[in-house]
Structures are given as C-alpha cells and as structure tokens.
Amino acid sequence: MAVRTAVIPAAGMGTRFLPATRATPKELLPIYDTPALQFVIDEAAQAGCTRVVIVTSRAKPSIENYASAASTDKVAVSVVYQESPLGLGHAVSCARQAVGDEPFVVMLPDEIMGDASLTKQLVALFEKSGKSSIGLKRVAAAEVSSYGNVKVASGASSTESSVAILQVVEKPKPADAVSDIVIIGRYVLSPKIFDKLEQIKPSANGELQLTDALAMLASENDLVGVVSEITRYDTGTPMGLLRAVIEIALERKDVGPQLNSWLKEKFTK
C-alpha cells in the first residue's frame, strides 16, 4: 500500500528554548529564514506524501495558523490536538482518526535531515516488505543512552541497507545497550502500530513511549530499518539549533559565501 500521509508531532512546549518559546513555538523557530516545521513539511512532500497531519497543543494556536498557510496544491496540511503531554506514543495515537487504516510516516520536527533520501528509502522499504520501517544510525557508546536503541539481525547491519530489528530498548544505561545503533526521527509505520499503542503501559514518567510499541513489532518480526549516514541536524536544543542555522546558511548560495567570509574574519583576528 502506498504511503501518502505524514504525521508530525509538534505538541511539546519547548521549555529548553525559553523565553523565545513564550512567543513562538519551537517548531516555528527559524533555521536562518525558514521555520524548522517547514523543512519537515517539504521533506514529506519530496518523499511523495500528499497529506501532512500535525499533532499539536491547543496552547500553540500559531501552529494551526501556520498549517493553514502551508498547504499547497501538492500537499494538504492539517492539525489534530494532543490534549495532554503524554509522550510520543500518545502523540502518534492522537493521529489515528486522521490517518485511518493506512501506513504513514512519522517525522520528528526537531530533527532536520539534509534531504529526503532516508524518508524515501523507508517508504520504499515499507512498500516492499509490508513491515514498519525506521531510520537508524550508529553513534558512540556514550551517546546511546540518549536514544532508542536497537539490536539488529546478525550480519545485516551494513550502512544504507535494510536490517531486521530484533529488539528495541528506550534510552538504556550504557551497560545495558544492545548495540551502537539508535533510532532517529523518521519512521514509516503500519496502522498496526495503533493497536500496539493501546496495549503498552505508561513509563515511569507517565508517558506512552513509541519505542515500547516498536518493541512489540520487533518481537513479532514485523520491524525493519535503514542504518543511514544522512546529514542530520538535532534542533531539539539551543546549541543544536544554532549549529543547524550556521551549517544550513553556509550551504546556501545567497548567503553562504558572505557568512563564510565573516566567520573567517571573526575567528582569525
């Protein structure tokens, strides 16, 4: 079945970015001159999605206003609401009625990818295998505890190839890590995920973790992934956002050369 819908969870309050997020949701903070949310909407369209569903909070009306303006003849953008901040799994479940009985992409807006290639790979992998497909990358051992961690089938972990996922663990302690491969914020999910989300229990902080539902799929041999080296900007922290602004601006023909010259001048004095 073709993948035509993308879900973007955007209900978080962005407390790391205070006081800026008192006025502007973190998803609308600019990466130079383009809101982070727009990068993800554009990526969804480039990956073949014709519909984007943003899961947001009623406390962030500017997200709904932006969604109305972001619709084009190629992609329709709408919103649904997450009434309580109960985690990523809960946010995804809030999109169930909008998604219907179809596969869909989940795209985390605080992870900006260099292009749409990984999402396209995951869509193609899902359409070929029929299994939920997730983006993966290798990290240093000290970083594993910041991510969902996966164990993949032996001998099937080469970069940019599809891998069978055997186990999923949410942010393990370093001693409990099952590999150096972690989940990044791109998922193509079967509608089966909604039933799994209904079965999982809240974590210690009261949230419903998407990784717990993915772990159930993995236990049923129904989860695969792509280990990628795609350029990725983590804009979930102020420093990550600053780095993304600088690196993306440097790549632009209209401002990159001037910015590069200014940086050289600034740091060679």
Language-model features: where?
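Generic secondary-structure signature for well-ordered alpha-helical cores
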Residues: 46, 68, 97-100, 124-131, ...
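Conserved beta-strand scaffold positions in the cores of enzyme catalytic domains, especially
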Residues: 28, 79, 132, 223-225, ...
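Short, conserved catalytic or adaptor-binding loops enriched in Gly and charged residues
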Residues: 69-74, 156-159, 216-218
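Cofactor-binding loop segments of dinucleotide-utilizing enzymes, especially the Rossmann-like FAD-
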Residues: 11, 56-57, 109, 137-138, ...
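Conserved alpha/beta core of the MobA/IspD/sugar-nucleotide pyrophosphorylase nucleotidyltransferase superfamily
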Residues: 161-164, 178-269
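Conserved core of the sugar-phosphate nucleotidyltransferase
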Residues: 114-196, 200, 204
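Conserved beta-strand termini and adjacent loop/short-helix elements that scaffold enzyme active sites
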Residues: 80-82, 136, 171, 226-229
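Conserved N-terminal catalytic core of the sugar/cofactor nucleotidyltransferase
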Residues: 1-8, 16-19, 29-30, 34-106, ...
